[in-house]
Curated annotation (Swiss-Prot):
Subcellular localization(s) per the UniProt record: Cell outer membrane
Gene Ontology CC: one annotated term: type II protein secretion system complex
Consequence recorded when altering V296I: In plasmid pCP301
Keyword field contains Lipid metabolism: no
Function: Component of the type III secretion system (T3SS), also called injectisome, which is used to inject bacterial effector proteins into eukaryotic host cells. Forms a ring-shaped multimeric structure with an apparent central pore in the outer membrane. Necessary for the secretion of Ipa invasins.
Gene3D superfamilies given in the database record: 3.30.1370.120, 3.55.50.30
Name of this chain's protein: Type 3 secretion system secretin
Family: Belongs to the bacterial secretin family. T3SS SctC subfamily.
Amino acid sequence: MKKFNIKSLTLLIVLLPLIVNANNIDSHLLEQNDIAKYVAQSDTVGSFFERFSALLNYPIVVSKQAAKKRISGEFDLSNPEEMLEKLTLLVGLIWYKDGNALYIYDSGELISKVILLENISLNYLIQYLKDANLYDHRYPIRGNISDKTFYISGPPALVELVANTATLLDKQVSSIGTDKVNFGVIKLKNTFVSDRTYNMRGEDIVIPGVATVVERLLNNGKALSNRQAQNDPMPPFNITQKVSEDSNDFSFSSVTNSSILEDVSLIAYPETNSILVKGNDQQIQIIRDIITQLDVAKRHIELSLWIIDIDKSELNNLGVNWQGTASFGDSFGASFNMSSSASISTLDGNKFIASVMALNQKKKANVVSRPVILTQENIPAIFDNNRTFYVSLVGERNSSLEHVTYGTLINVIPRFSSRGQIEMSLTIEDGTGNSQSNYNYNNENTSVLPEVGRTKISTIARVPQGKSLLIGGYTHETNSNEIISIPFLSSIPVIGNVFKYKTSNISNIVRVFLIQPREIKESSYYNTAEYKSLISEREIQKTTQIIPSETTLLEDEKSLVSYLNY
């Protein structure tokens, strides 16, 4: 009996920790609909993230100061990244992930550092960190562009990593040789390496590529051809554009000796949108630095153009006054920006179009055309709807064939100004001619050419977000002939002409141009949490049963369906 009690007591002592541990696991990890939940009961930050490390697939390093804090509560582990963001915000922690480990610090451990670059530009350093997936947008690098000095504040692991990277890259550039000839390939991601040419009414507009720009820089502008010099695609605006945080207008103060860039060869390779560089290592590094700063992503702008003809009397009834005000009903008003070359106003385009559509039902307005063009900032968008007639010029010994082109031409060069407003350089040409298909001949048997009228508007305007630009207001006369007849009676042969008559009407038509600019932002990654309430279980089942032969789902698809059903 005594031996039995000793054995029982020994077995109880051995199994007691296992029983307690099993109960502890059951109380901490609860499985509900295949989604893990964790209940923390005054756990330290270190012990909490030890259990959390496997879900993130990263080793977690917790500082001593952060490890002193304790956490209590129930946590949903279905989305570890989201839970990490919320938890660190509530507890007062900061973190940084370098791709190999997750570093967690107390918010009081945040450090700052000012670093001076000598041989590389700030943009080159930022681009290097982004390419290596080391840059954290939560802790941006802020710097003085002209002095190549930057400031960074964040978790110690991030600050030390950026400082060490900047020092290493600076030393690499300073140790580059200047004697050995080498070759480099620089690939562009956001802009074109070769020149682009647009034709506008027989005139070529050349937008220089990066290769041409860099070559002009190396040759002190001597490579600029006469054709390109006469057709500058982007005239300078009078308003200074505010430099944004992501601006890449960095200086090159490190290149003080112009002889450094002598004997450098550049060749554009459009097939891969790359530039081939021949020179020593230092020259290649300088060219790479320049191209990196020029190769920036441009924002997209959608331009909706409305060409509208409105009866002059109805336009006055709409309340448009080109001298300063416009009103549409009792609840809307707009102020106008006057120009010496055109009448311009910024207004709510949707309300104006609604009024035009109402007049269109009464045949008092007509939408002549409505093209939609997608372009990039600082890139011209051209709409040209023209007609051409040809004239033969016959002399005593030679002859030639000339042409005259007229129609509607709209050339818009948009750019973003301060406060997100869209600034546009506009050139509008509207031409009309008589509709004679054949030439008339006078008594001397000489052809009488048709008459062509042109109206040209050139201006610069700034449009706030969500507003439209109204341009025009010039009047022209139109002649319209209409035959009015009595049904059935007018179709009787011979005597039917008595029951119909012809009317002529001369009206004054005002042509206006409405331009609606809109920024097209890049689509972000799909967040299933946003669509969770929109997709029902029945729709998911229909989606998975479209192809009967597919009886199984991939693991990612199973996770998505499980998450949406939760």
